[in-house]
Amino acid sequence: MTNKRKTAGDRVLVLGAGYGGLMAALRAADEADVTVIDPAAHFSERVREHEVAAGRDDISHPLSSFLEKKRIRHVAARVTDIDPVRKEVVTDDRRRHPYDLLVYALGSRTQTFGDGSTEDGRLFTSETARYLRKRLDDGPGTLTVVGGGATGVEMASELAEAERAWKISMVTAGEVGPALSEKGRTHVRSTFRDLGISLEEGRPAAPEDLDADVIVWTASLRANAEIARSAGLALTVDGRIQVDAMLRSVSHPDIYVVGDAAAARTAAAGELRMACATALPLGSRAGRNIVAELRGKRPKPLSFRYYAQVMSLGRRNGLVQFVGADDKPKDLIVTGRKAALLKEQVVRSTVRSLRLAAR
């Protein structure tokens, strides 16, 4: 249990309890008086959402199990506004929460056409995996995954393995696995054939163009930065929050930004992609920088490079794509059951790292 005495000026609000926000809160709590604002009572392993769609029972952990030892408070509410002049955050229960330093960690969401719905209720995303699971239980039919990135590939593979009665297909505007090497893409295509997944590459599609009983949209992610925009924070053209090397908003240096909402970059990696693999290091660095700032020390710039991309292709197959520091694929992969086990270990390590930070 943390017993240190907090001092004036160390109130830190963390908006969002995903990978980046939770890690930032745990690191900052070594020196700061930390409050996490998130409507959920549980931390959810977002990288396992495709497993939920295929029937996994639970991917959540009580937030209290991470926060209690470091005396981090949790406000179960949704952020509606940030007032950077008064240094307050407003939540949907109309409460105002003052801060000295703020961590913006509201993540991202799947970007769909229009309001993301269809009149006939056919459209689902990774975020609605539990509802998708219920729909699949209603009976067999046809299901199309839109988007050939890692999220779509994992979703299609997992469902095809678990739901043999359903006819699974994928439609993607470009090549499947655009971030993979040719060897990696070949393995994905071979796996799809083995699982009976029909693949159509080079076809842009809208939901109304698809004749399927169920559509799972995984085509792109969008940062949840609308609240930041309303508060006047500087954003990039693609809607992420501009940050400096220390992960502070370039327009509001008392606001740190982590996770998918941050347009963070390093010399080695370039601009970081939206991923759990980047969210945890961002959260850790922001939290440590807050501690340094409160101790009167100089915050340090983010240091980050890529090593590999890991992908599950069902429970018994996977793909490890080795990459350079800048995330460009090398001509080296690991496949099969060994890759599936490595993927599982990587996923488990994310929760382990949070547990270690919570001690």
Identify the meaning behind each predicted range.
Residues M1-R11, K69-T144, V216:
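FAD-binding core/adjacent interface of flavoenzyme oxidoreductases
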Residues T2-I72, E154-E182:
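Beta1-alpha1 glycine-rich phosphate/pyrophosphate-binding loop at the start
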Residues H74-I82, H97, A162-A245, P299:
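A Rossmann-like FAD-binding core segment of flavoenzymes
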Residues S117-P140, D209-P281:
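FAD-site-proximal beta/loop scaffold in flavoenzymes
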Residues Y131, R135-W166:
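Rossmann-like NAD(P)H-binding beta-loop-alpha module
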Residues V243, A261-G314:
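A conserved FAD-binding loop/helix module that cradles the flavin
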Residues R315-R359:
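C-terminal auxiliary extensions adjacent to catalytic cores
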